[in-house]
């Protein structure tokens, strides 16, 4: 069984037991969180779509770790004007492990 969930403004296709990284969620490591924005559920050939959410469907996940992604370098330049700007960014993330999909 799989589910399509929405968290942090993005959509993820998840399966029970899978680990994946999402935008930072303020939760302690080891705590269980419930993701209730389930957009679709699937099992084999049957697929259940929500409009926009599947009623009564939830995904239970455990917080594995918090961290930061690799640095993204931003370089801006105006030709012939001697203008150069360097900038970097590291986005925070939370790693989750899916415990169960209910619905």
Swiss-Prot record:
GO terms for biological process: translation. Coiled coil: none annotated. GO terms for cellular component: cytoplasm; ribonucleoprotein complex; ribosome. PROSITE patterns: RIBOSOMAL_L21. SUPFAM superfamilies: L21p-like. Keywords: Ribonucleoprotein, Ribosomal protein, RNA-binding, rRNA-binding. GO terms for molecular function: rRNA binding; structural constituent of ribosome. Disulfide bonds: none annotated. It comes from the Bacteria. Belongs to the bacterial ribosomal protein bL21 family. This protein binds to 23S rRNA in the presence of protein L20. Part of the 50S ribosomal subunit. Contacts protein L20. This is Large ribosomal subunit protein bL21. It comes from Janthinobacterium sp. (strain Marseille).
């Amino acid at each position: 069984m799989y589910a399509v969930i929405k968290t942090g403004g993005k959509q993820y296709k998840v399966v029970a037991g899978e680990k994946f990284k999402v935008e930072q969620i303020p939760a302690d490591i080891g705590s269980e969180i419930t993701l209730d924005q389930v957009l679709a559920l699937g099992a084999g050939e049957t697929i259940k779509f929500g409009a926009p959410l599947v009623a009564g469907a939830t995904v239970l996940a455990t917080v594995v770790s918090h961290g930061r992604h690799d640095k993204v370098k931003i370089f801006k330049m105006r030709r012939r004007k001697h203008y150069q700007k360097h900038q970097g960014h590291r986005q925070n993330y939370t790693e989750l492990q899916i415990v169960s999909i209910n619905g």
